[in-house]
């Protein structure tokens, strides 16, 4: 199996498969309401909503940069608590997450193993494409763990 195929499997498993952590995102978020997602369970911490929004923002950000877009991340790092916390807005965010997963799947389907060790241009050569893609997986896992903990406190 090629390295890109392994990466595709890691993305798919983390989202809705059988990840080694035994925690997949779709299961974590399934029964969380918009009210629960927006709740600041720990006042100094991010809400579940903010964490999902942050993950989606970074997934989109890195993918766009891998595809050649040039832009800057927002100063809030995609962590602003939303004004609209309606069920429709929550569903919209979850749909955006699902679309992000599909966008990564499409990107990875077209990626060749030979390109994995090319420099990730926005990092000015400090990181490879391989490292940045794995970084997104680690980033998601880290924040999904936070979501699991916050969900237990609901």
Stretches found by the model and what they are:
Residues 2-4, 8-22, 26-29, 34-80, ...:
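Short, contiguous alpha-helical
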Residues 84-117, 134-136:
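Acidic/histidine-rich alpha-helical segments that form the ligand environment
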């Amino acid at each position: 199996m090629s390295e890109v195929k392994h990466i595709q499997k890691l993305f798919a498993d983390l989202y809705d498969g059988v990840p080694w952590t035994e925690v997949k995102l779709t299961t974590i978020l399934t029964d969380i309401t918009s009210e629960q997602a927006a709740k600041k369970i720990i006042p100094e911490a991010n809400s579940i909503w903010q964490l999902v929004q942050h993950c989606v923002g970074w997934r989109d950000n890195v993918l766009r940069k891998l595809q050649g877009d040039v832009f800057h991340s927002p100063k809030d790092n995609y962590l602003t608590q939303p004004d609209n916390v309606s069920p429709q807005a929550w569903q919209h965010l979850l749909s955006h997450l699902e679309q992000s997963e599909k966008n990564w799947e499409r990107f990875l389907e077209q990626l060749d193993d030979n390109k994995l060790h090319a420099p990730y241009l926005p990092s000015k050569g400090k990181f490879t494409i391989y490292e940045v893609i794995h970084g997104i997986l680690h980033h998601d896992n880290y924040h999904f763990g936070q979501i699991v903990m916050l969900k237990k406190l609901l």
